[in-house]
Amino acid sequence: DFERYSGRLNYNVYPTKWFKTGLNLGVTRTVSNYSTSDSGNSSSYSNLTRFIRTMAPIYPVHKHDLETGAYLDANGKATTDPGEYIYDYEGTRLSNNGRDAIAETEFNQRELVRVNQTGHTYLTLTPVEGLNLTANYSINNIDYRRKVYENPYVGDGTAGPGRLNQMSTRTLTQTFNQLITYSKSIGNHNFDVLLGHENYSYKYEYLYGMKTQETVSGMYEFGNFVNISSLSSYTNTYKKEGYFGRIN
């Protein structure tokens, strides 16, 4: 499933002819859930479309009695209730042995949450005709979180048994500039001058962790898993400052 929420505010003020300012804010939040971490990979065993196209129809989706054809429940008894059917991912079939994309689609979980926040504000002064002093500030912050659970029964998670990995990133960019512009007309001649100064900063934070050996089913938090399989983090930063000008 997929959910998206967004909002925006744009406000400008002109209290006098020599002063104006404004504010522009925006926020977007998206939440999406997928069956498995590799469902978007066309060559993955857990890709449901690939699995259906390459799996021979002689292999059943659910366990059944080989003589009567009746579907079986978890106790090996015949049942006609679809809610009691169990997937047939055990055994020694020649095609995709040990995998069942349909079961993995139901058992696995993948949640993606992304929040994008943007803001821009400015201030312009016009002390004399033709002269403008402007300051601009912009900020953009993107928070991204991914949580992937792989079940202990079938698929990649059986090695855990059961495993959970989470990734979190934050990208923050900021820009602050100051501009001086002056325009003047003398007879048939027009003059335009621009002087500017700008600061830019970028920061990216990354955190990833994976734990294996699930304790209790249905609880998708690190505290429910025993062994730390992977844990890493890093931060990238970049800053620059510039001056520029133009004369026309």
Per-segment meaning from a language model:
Residues F2-R8, G242:
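Transmembrane beta-barrel architecture of outer membranes
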Residues N10, H120-Y122, T126, L179-T181, ...:
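Outer-membrane beta-barrel architecture
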Residues N12-N116, T134-G242:
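Surface-exposed loop/interface segments of Gram-negative outer-membrane beta-barrel transport/assembly proteins
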Residues G130:
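Active-site and adjacent substrate-binding regions of carbohydrate-active enzymes
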